[in-house]
């Protein structure tokens, strides 16, 4: 299991939002390549990048920055989400050195697109499921749908999806702990590996996720930037064979 640092990109800076509200942001850095290098130095084995402007615009806005990070970290697996709505965009990112591309809104609006992407780019597609009270949200979390997160995950069980990134919006950026029950439920219901996101605040949250069936990793943002979670300590905890 991996602890995966999040680098959220907004207006060329690394920020953290609260519950996805673009106006409620905290800027942590304006040197994104250096931020990525910092987390690598701290022991990161994968990076999670989100183009926040892209998520709202419906098209990538931070392509050059993502390319620069990928070029600076050629051996590091990188996953990117936000505004990915075409096969051309996926191809562009993979050719630039990104390892995994996260499809979110488009997965809800056009599930066939995910299946097509999995056929074209096998092993490189992650579905991002963002949910408020168990219901899927789209377009940078601006719209909450009537689609259940578990039903959407099940829809892609046989599509060839690499994994699911599951974000509990109510917990995201709020430092209130991770929703272990819903995350594990999603993994068990879908049969797909799940990366937990939203609310990973301290080592207790990491302990609660450790050993849970189907949990591939946990994304953490505000906690590692504000210091309530030490990335290296968290990964060491997960690497131990004991709880």
From Swiss-Prot:
One of its GO terms (molecular function) is 1-(5-phosphoribosyl)-5-[(5-phosphoribosylamino)methylideneamino]imidazole-4-carboxamide isomerase activity. GO terms for biological process: L-histidine biosynthetic process; L-tryptophan biosynthetic process. It is an enzyme of class 5 (isomerase). Its main location: cytoplasm. It catalyses: 1-(5-phospho-beta-D-ribosyl)-5-[(5-phospho-beta-D-ribosylamino)methylideneamino]imidazole-4-carboxamide = 5-[(5-phospho-1-deoxy-D-ribulos-1-ylimino)methylamino]-1-(5-phospho-beta-D-ribosyl)imidazole-4-carboxamide. The active site is at residues 8, 130. Keywords: Amino-acid biosynthesis, Cytoplasm, Histidine biosynthesis, Isomerase. It comes from the Bacteria. It is found in: Cytoplasm. Its EC number is 5.3.1.16. Belongs to the HisA/HisF family. NCBIfam families: 1-(5-phosphoribosyl)-5-[(5-phosphoribosylamino)methylideneamino]imidazole-4-carboxamide isomerase. This is 1-(5-phosphoribosyl)-5-[(5-phosphoribosylamino)methylideneamino] imidazole-4-carboxamide isomerase. The gene is hisA.
């Amino acid at each position: 299991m991996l602890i995966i640092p999040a680098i959220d990109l907004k207006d060329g800076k690394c920020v953290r939002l609260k519950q996805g509200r673009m106006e409620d942001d905290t800027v942590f850095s304006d040197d994104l390549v250096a931020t990525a290098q910092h987390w690598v130095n701290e022991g990161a084995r994968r990076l999670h990048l989100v183009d926040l402007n892209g998520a709202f615009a419906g098209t990538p806005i931070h392509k050059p920055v993502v390319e620069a990070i990928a070029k600076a970290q050629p051996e590091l697996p990188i996953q990117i989400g936000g505004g990915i709505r075409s096969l051309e965009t996926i191809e562009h990112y993979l050719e630039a050195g990104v390892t995994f591309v996260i499809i979110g809104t488009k997965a809800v609006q056009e599930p066939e697109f995910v299946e097509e992407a999995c056929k074209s780019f096998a092993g490189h597609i992650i579905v991002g499921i963002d949910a408020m009270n168990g219901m899927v949200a789209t377009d940078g979390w601006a719209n909450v749908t009537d689609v259940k997160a578990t039903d959407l995950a099940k829809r892609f069980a046989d599509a060839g999806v690499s994994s699911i990134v599951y974000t509990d919006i109510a917990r995201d950026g709020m430092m209130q702990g991770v929703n272990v029950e819903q995350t594990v439920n999603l993994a068990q219901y879908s049969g797909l590996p799940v990366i937990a996101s939203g609310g990973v605040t301290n080592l207790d949250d990491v302990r609660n996720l450790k050993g849970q069936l189907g949990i591939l990793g946990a994304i953490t943002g505000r906690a590692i930037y504000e210091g309530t979670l030490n990335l290296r300590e968290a990964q060491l905890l997960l690497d131990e064979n004991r709880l």
